[in-house]
Amino acid sequence: MTTSDEVIKGYVEIESRVDKMRDKYALQEGYIDGEGSPWVPFVPNVYIKHLTFDIRSSSAANVLWVQAGGELGRHRHRGPVSGYVIEGTWNYREYSWVAKAGDFVRESPGRTHTLYSEKGMKTFFWLNGPLEFLDAEDRVMESVDVFWFINHYETYCQENGIPVDQRLYL
C-alpha cells in the first residue's frame, strides 16, 4: 500500500467514527414549513415569526416583519447578530446605510441602535445572546433572550388556540 492509500484509508476510518458518533448523539435535521409558526405581535407595527430556539447557545432565529413606519425601540445586543433582508428596506436611525432586499447585515455585540422601516420590511435574523432595550439614559428597561422568545411564542399560541410546534426547539 502506498502512503497516499494509507492516508485515504486513515481518513475514511476517522470519518466512519465521526458518522457513528453523529448518529448516536446529534439531533435529527429539522424542517419547518413556512406556515409552521405564526406572526406574533412584538411591539406596535412589528411582528416576529419564530423559526428556532436554541437554549444550548442562547440563540434564536426569526423573521422580523416591520410594517410601514414601524420601529423596534433603541436596543443593544450582548452577542453577535446576522440578518438577511427578504423584502423591503430598513435602517438604524444611528447609521447612514439602508438595508434592502438581498442585503446581509452583521452586528457586533454592544452596539446601540434603533431599527426603523419607512415602507416596511421582512428580515431573517439569527440572534445570539440577549437583546437589551434601553431608555434615553442607557438604562436597561427590558432584556429579551431565548427564554423570553420561547415564552413570547408559547403564550401567543396558547392564547390563540395554536398548537406549539415542537420542531422549533433545539
What do these predicted regions represent?
Residues I86-G88, Y95, G110, E118, ...:
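Beta-hairpin (beta-strand-turn-beta-strand) motif
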Residues M1-S58, S143-V146, I150-L170:
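A short, N-terminal "cap"/entry segment at the start of jelly-roll beta-barrel domains
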Residues V63-V66, V85-G88, F104, L115, ...:
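Short, well-ordered beta-strand segments in beta-rich or mixed alpha/beta enzyme
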